[in-house]
């Protein structure tokens, strides 16, 4: 059975950085991810979306950010297993952990870093009439290629960051962008909301009732005011339903972790209630701290978890190993 000092579960941005930092701390690392390719939501959901809230970049395309993180994660030669789902976590008699996967893999490790985000992702659906019928025929749940919306009349449903960001992203290339939200308050950055009102038609207190088409593609959408019930028919070529995604954590919920809803509870050292097991990123809920689901926050958590794990593996090691600019690893 292969043996490691740390197994990182989850190949999104935080897991990738945790893989890099664990390698920086000279630990033998295995990264396990259930997707076909590394990068998490940056790659699977919005590869062409611009990311602005990561330090060092005034703006970077999600796919490009993922590629840089993957390159960084591979610097110290970690083992990587994609298309494998971490199924069980078991404690051995010698105090180590064994991670078993759905593909029959068994991996022994001294520590585990869980960076699983919200788990396996599926889009949240509205249940509007015609929604399923026209899925991938004009009804979408994310934007993988902006070019598909060039010159089209686009309706966006949602009021969060993703919905607002897609309105801003598509406005310059689409023929027309309309956004509807069931409330009049948006769960997005204030500046982005302000800019959205300048470039898109916005209907607050409105919901999607029905998607219509000619059998091959979307041609219309019926929306309604949820206060007055008044309906309005819009001529559209595409409907983007951006109301979030559902995550499946699978058997992780049975691992004996202290959970708060769907989050794993950790202390300031990113330690869970299981010795040698840490949680970072969107899946972690730090006691006494506000939750900010930001990549930048996850990077810091991953560095903390890696450093604390190093001390767990080697009690003589320092938690803080110094600045990377001073390390021999990077001196040529």
Curated annotation (Swiss-Prot):
Q: So what EC number does this one have?
A: 1.18.1.2
- Give a GO molecular function annotation for the protein: NADP binding
**Any binding details for the cofactor?**
Binds 1 FAD per subunit.
Q: Does the keyword NADP apply?
A: yes
Q: Name one Pfam family in it.
A: Pyr_redox_2
| InterPro entries found in the cross-reference section | FAD/NAD-bd_sf, FAD/NAD-binding_dom, Fd--NADP_Rdtase_type_2, Ferredoxin-NADP_redctase_2
Keyword Flavoprotein among UniProt keywords: yes
Q: Which reaction does it catalyse?
A: 2 reduced [2Fe-2S]-[ferredoxin] + NADP(+) + H(+) = 2 oxidized [2Fe-2S]-[ferredoxin] + NADPH
Q: Give the cofactors, semicolon-separated.
A: FAD
Name the keywords, alphabetized: FAD, Flavoprotein, NADP, Oxidoreductase
Per UniProt, where does FAD bind?
33, 41, 46, 86, 121, 282, 325
User: Its family?
Assistant: Belongs to the ferredoxin--NADP reductase type 2 family.
Tell me which PANTHER family the record gives: THIOREDOXIN REDUCTASE 1-RELATED-RELATED
Assembly, per entry: Homodimer.
Q: What is this protein called?
A: Ferredoxin--NADP reductase
Which source organism does the UniProt entry give?
A: Metallosphaera sedula (strain ATCC 51363 / DSM 5348 / JCM 9185 / NBRC 15509 / TH2)
Write the lineage as a comma-separated list.
Archaea, Thermoproteota, Thermoprotei, Sulfolobales, Sulfolobaceae
